[in-house]
Regions:
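Domain-level signal for soluble alpha/beta catalytic cores
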Residues: 2-390
Length: 390
């Protein structure tokens, strides 16, 4: 597939990073552990003991606190921790016009780690009508974050458009609606482009597309799954990159966009493994974003060699600090790994973050609130010592 021209133009910009433009030297992916009072409020709401307005008050209070804490530890950007969501992606996808939530038991998802494993058939999204944007998804949530953050730049995370397609592929798209997948991709990209435009109009200047598919495609088992549901395991990542670029084409120059790519993060379990080598050349050269949040917290993620494809004018945020357990990494170990990565790409193009969010789903990972904040403080302190600024 020929190189995408918009991506080439984007990466051909000056290699000097504009002051104040994300991603930052010390950054984080987005989700944060839900406080116990919020989890209780959600349980009460689910059984009718709490009204929607009361739940919103609890959410608002929790978000004010996590924004305060992000600013206190020294981060230059702040998210709402995704505290209003059940999961990082489906809360968004189900709000797209043309999407319906279905229980498809034929598509199973497996997560595991060294201690446990979990397999189930979660509800999935099926396309049953032409895709449209019926309202600005997460618009109210972003506006609250915008008005709450004081010293930090408000950052919004949304699932990448590839997540609408990845799990079910062709089988999850009604052929009477989209007999031709080219029209599906055109409508999906246009829908996302409109969402991006509306978020910008609300004041969003830092937007992140979360995209596990681009990491999953490095795993031979995941490519096997893609083939089984009628996809193209060799080139599907290129199709995703092409359509993400269509959604971002012509975005305002002061809107920074990043993408985060991990291999699954559900209650400290993961779904895929493998380094970034399979997608790296197309990913780093063609995807028209400002920065890449990449997971590198353990051997599942492979080595740093794929960084040799990163062009000038883009940043890579090294996800070296794990969110899957509470043990605190050492600064010296982090600095050694940053030095290792800098063998393949200029140190000035690197940043530091956790490998993923702390709570991609409402249940959260196996660590405490104190451990979460300690890890974010460590990232800020380490970045300050390595680069001399944040």
């Amino acid at each position: 597939m020929p190189r995408d021209q918009s991506a080439q133009q984007h990466s051909a910009a000056s290699t000097a990073w504009p002051p104040g433009r994300p991603p930052f030297r010390a950054d984080h992916v987005g989700s944060l552990l839900r406080p116990p009072e919020l989890l209780r409020a959600r349980e009460d709401f689910a059984v009718g003991r709490l009204g929607a307005d009361q739940l919103r008050e609890v959410e608002d209070a929790a978000i004010r606190e996590v924004v305060r804490m992000q600013q206190e530890v020294g981060l230059r950007d702040a998210t709402d921790g995704e505290l209003r969501r059940e999961s990082w992606h489906m809360d968004f996808i189900y709000q797209l016009g043309g999407i319906t939530k279905v229980q498809d038991d034929t598509i199973r998802v497996a997560f595991h780690n060294e201690q446990k494993s979990y397999e189930w058939a979660p509800p999935s999204a099926h396309v049953v009508a032409p895709l449209t944007l019926e309202h600005t998804i997460f618009g109210e949530a972003f506006s609250f974050l915008r008005d709450t953050a004081t010293t930090a730049l408000p950052k919004l995370t949304i699932p990448s458009l590839s997540m609408v397609h990845y799990r079910g592929g062709r089988s999850a798209i009604d052929e009477s609606v989209y007999p031709d997948l080219d029209q599906f991709w055109a409508d999906l990209a246009a829908t996302y482009a409109e969402e991006v435009r509306r978020l910008y109009d609300l004041g969003c200047r830092y937007l992140q597309f979360d995209d596990t598919s681009l990491a999953y495609m490095n795993d031979p088992e995941q490519r096997k799954h893609v083939a089984e549901i009628g996809g193209d395991p060799r080139h599907q990542h290129e199709r995703y990159i092409e359509n993400i670029n269509r959604a971002l084409a012509g975005r305002p120059a002061d809107l920074a966009v990043t993408t985060h790519m991990c291999r699954g993060n559900n209650q400290s379990m993961w779904a895929a493994e493998g380094g970034y080598e399979f997608v790296a050349e197309a990913l780093f050269n063609d995807l028209a974003v400002d920065g890449f949040f990449c997971e590198w917290d353990d051997e599942r993620s492979g080595g740093f060699e794929p960084l040799r494809f990163v062009p000038k004018g883009k940043r890579v945020v090294l996800g070296l600090v794990t969110t899957k357990h509470g043990d605190l990494e050492s600064k010296d170990a982090l600095k050694r790994r940053i030095d290792d990565a800098a063998r393949f790409v200029d140190l000035d193009q690197l940043c530091l973050s956790p490998q993923c969010g702390f709570s991609s789903t409402k249940e959260g990972n196996d660590l405490t609130q104190d451990q979460q904040w300690a890890k974010l403080r460590l990232i800020v302190e380490t970045a300050q010592e390595v680069w001399g600024s944040l």
